[in-house]
Amino acid sequence: MSVIFETHAHYEDEAFDEDRDELIKSLPESGIGYVVNVGSSIATCHRTVELIKHYDYMYGALGIHPGEIHEVTDDDMKWIETEAKTNPKIVSVGEIGLDYYWMESSKEEQKKFFKAQIELAKKLDMPIIVHDRDAHGDTLDILRETKPKGVVHCFSGSKEMAREIIKLGMYIGLNGVVTFNNARKSLEVAKEIPIERL
């Protein structure tokens, strides 16, 4: 039987409070052999570190989502760096990137913070998990400039953008949108991506 590696989960979320342990323990029976739980705020990063202690098959990613950067201190970022350096179960920096839909912080602040987190990932020799919402051009420009390892999660860009990301050696994550009846664009993009880059 093949084993699924779930690369992007948020089991620390309060939506799982009632049955989190039961659900996570059932994952191996469902064919899910490994899970990366992804932090997106300083609070969810702390919860991720606590959560992954309890399951051998669960790993963590620590990073600050663009909608949360206004809440983060220098001490928080030092904690993330130290935890990523010293905890062998931290495997990635994410979820990081740009979000021009919600605009919790200015575009310039988001770009600066995105680049800083990419530099942290490179210093740690870790891949990144990229969040890109309504910011395709700037996201691609920063990825071209910094050339990190990683995945653009929940990809919503064009097939041309997908080709560029693949040229950079990165991966593309697609979500359930590709199953929707009106998901023509997502399906066209999916056809362009080599299976080894999904």
Please place each PLM-identified region on the residue numbering.
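Mid-domain alpha/beta scaffold segments of enzyme catalytic cores
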Residues: 1-198
